[in-house]
Amino acid sequence: FDDAISSSMLCQLIINKIISIVRAQKFLLKKTVSKLIFVGRNVSISNKVSISKYTVIGDYTKIDGLGVKGVIIGRNCNIGAFCRIICSVNYRQAGDSIDIKDNVAIGEFSYVGGASKVVIGKDTIIGQYLSIHPENHIFQNKTIPIRMQGTTKKGVNIGENCWIGSKVTFTDGSSIGNRCVVGAGSVITKKFPDNVLIVGSPAKIVKNI
């Protein structure tokens, strides 16, 4: 521990961790939720959700696995407070899946939709206000209301060992490779290879890294 952390602060940290483990016990009826996860205040976990051990779920976060495969969260992940990880946005058409691999950190106030398949690779760190939308409205027909034209569902894939800044948006069909860095506020609308720095709206490759 850092020398700046006093013994009293450390004791409070340990107490808070114990409380979060106790909170997690109410989710143990779900056989796919580990006994050793840390759950914040007013967290909601429902439907098809699998969470591996040592994962932290922040206060007021909602995880809903209503979908074909549901939500899978790996070991040692950290999901920030006030996040929404939701497979289906309505009950008329079930979503697919959200697969968050081991050692992923997602900042506070993030939204991950699962209308089609979303994968976040292991060891990826993500800032606050991430937004992932794995579907897109079709709007080409001028005679039909946009809401009635259906959606595309190509999915979103984020590689391993990436660093994604705050307020980044991924749209349907977009992906980034392994070891990519994405600048804050970028909008990812297409596919990017491994080992690149990506910035802008719409995002472009700035350089190889």
Predicted regions: what is each one?
Residues L36, G155, N195:
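A residue-level signal for beta-strand positions that form part of recognition/binding surfaces
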Residues V33-K35, V49, G67, V89, ...:
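Short linear functional motifs in flexible/disordered or boundary regions
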Residues F1-Y54:
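Extended, small-residue-rich solenoid/repeat segments and analogous flexible loops
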Residues I57-D172, S201, I209:
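Flexible, glycine/small-residue-enriched loop-and-beta-strand segment within the central core
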Residues I72, S175-V199, A203:
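C-terminal/domain-terminus segments
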Residues Q25, S52, R75, I100-D102, ...:
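Generic cytosolic/nucleocytoplasmic N-terminal low-complexity/intrinsically disordered segments
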